[in-house]
Amino acid sequence: MCIRDRDNKGEKQMLLKVVTFNIAHGKGMDGEVNLERQAKLINAYKPDIVFLQEIDMYTKRAENKNQIREFSKKVYLPYCSMESNITFENGYYGDGIISRFPISFSTNYLMPLTDPKHEQRGILCNKIILGTAKINLFSVHLSTYEEERILSTKELMKIIDKIDDDEIIIIGGDFNVGVTRIGKNKYTYEKRSEYEEYNMIEKSLIKLDNTDDTWFSDLGQGCIDTMFYSKNITLKKFETINSNMTSDHYAIYAEFNI
């Protein structure tokens, strides 16, 4: 983060650097679980905030490690938050947020399911305070079933609608738009000119205009990762980060003037 004068009156403006990345519990396209190489990619951008999806805590496949703590250390950011959406291999699995700044509030909202056999999804919310700015951060990983994504988006908008207008909102994550699960580990992806999930969010927030594919796997590929931000901040630039096979997702980087 850097701070500079916003105008001749001396009002200060902050540059906030944000990344969102579905790390697939550290698993690369080669099958190796390696947080180090994922963190190395992110470190090059020196972010202030990192949204992570598909984080493990104390699972066998993660060698019983607390991945959010490990990733936090590897990207040199001292504060982190992770909430479990499901229990898995005697551990936990969910989403995380890593921050350069103290987290003053953290909660996880479990999303509705249309079938109890479907994977439980959640939306992790953190709040940080920078001077007079209150910043609400959301790490999102929506369902691979469209009906559940729409229900979850409606729940997300209910949460956002309760936030004061002068507070800042930044959402990052894997929205799975256009993805349909057709069986165990089988998916289809449909590219559309617009998605109902995005249309609902864009009534209140601004979406990054990223269009490059962010999901690559034997199961399919498409642009399903992005960020949204409130209208009281401005976007300086954004970039899709090639993860170099360290995950089946690319990361998204954005800079905001706050």
Task: Describe every region a protein language model picked out.
Residues R4-I49, Y79-E83, T87-I258:
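Active-site regions of metal-assisted phosphoester/phosphodiester hydrolases
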Residues G26, Q53-K60:
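Active-site neighborhood of divalent metal-dependent phosphoester/pyrophosphate hydrolases
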Residues Y58-R61, E89-G91:
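Short active-site-adjacent helix-start/loop capping segments
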